[in-house]
Amino acid sequence: GFNSKVMDFSGDMPKFLGARPCVIDFYATWCGPCQRMAPMIEILAQKYGGKVDFYRVDVDKEKELAGDVFVIEAMPTFLNIDKSGAINSTTGAINAKEMISNIEKFCLD
């Protein structure tokens, strides 16, 4: 899944494997702001379909990925990864305008 499609962790440094830029949403089922943002993320995934890939990672199910690899400390956390593998991180609930701005700035520029 994620390891073979998005990141390769086999070497010394993680390597981005995605064909397109992506947004990774680190969330928890018990996180209120995460649940409130979920419908917006679905809409944006459709809006940017074919240009930006979206992934949702449940931090409780993917403890190693969330905690050890990306060191996610608060939810929701969004990682915007461009085609070169550069990562921009945003933590906390944000509105659609901010999310779109981040996608346009960090994923599509």
Positions of predicted regions on the chain:
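A short beta-strand-turn-helix
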Residues: 1-22
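Acidic phosphotransfer microenvironment of two-component signaling modules
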Residues: 1-3, 63-64, 97
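Conserved hydrophobic/aromatic "anchor" residues
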Residues: 2, 26-27, 81
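Short pre-active-site segment immediately N-terminal to redox-active cysteine/selenocysteine motifs
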Residues: 19-22, 27-30, 74
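Thiol-based oxidoreductase modules, predominantly thioredoxin-like and allied folds used
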Residues: 26, 38-45, 49-64
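Cys/His/Pro-rich metal-binding microdomains
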Residues: 32-35, 79
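A short glycine-leucine-enriched loop at secondary-structure breakpoints
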Residues: 68-73
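Non-catalytic, surface beta->alpha helical segment in thiol-disulfide oxidoreductase systems
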Residues: 74, 79-109
